[in-house]
């Protein structure tokens, strides 16, 4: 697990964010999480062109309600690696690559000891 940046001043997120780089396949993605109460873990899945920091307030609302939260910069989004040289491009060769990203995020949730059950809150993609 390699620490990754988290821009708290932009996110308006709760304290205690842990951000890490993960590398499913050839691309590096960024995952952030907050460990809170024992009500379970909400997996916040941002939409296309979005980043972890956009969901800081939502994470704060969930943490205040006793949920842990984990979220992701999908490959080609936020601070994650891109497949093409253009930093504004979010291209993937196959949608299955997003499944690899999700698998890596779930493995990080397990590694971090984030509580069950898991809930999904997603936008766009």
Question: Where do the model's predicted regions map?
Answer:
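Conserved alpha/beta-hydrolase
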Residues: 52, 59-85
């Amino acid at each position: 697990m390699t620490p990754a940046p988290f821009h708290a001043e932009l996110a308006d997120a709760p304290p205690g964010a842990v951000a890490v780089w993960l590398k499913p396949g050839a691309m590096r993605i960024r995952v952030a999480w907050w460990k809170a109460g024992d009500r379970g873990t909400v997996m916040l899945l941002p939409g296309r062109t979005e980043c972890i920091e956009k969901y800081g307030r939502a994470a704060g609302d969930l943490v205040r309600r006793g949920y842990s939260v984990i979220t992701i910069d999908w490959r080609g989004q936020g601070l994650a690696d891109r497949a093409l040289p253009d930093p504004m491009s979010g291209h993937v060769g196959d949608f299955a690559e997003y499944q690899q990203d999700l698998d890596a995020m779930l493995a990080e949730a397990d590694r971090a000891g984030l509580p069950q059950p898991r809930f999904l809150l997603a936008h766009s993609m």
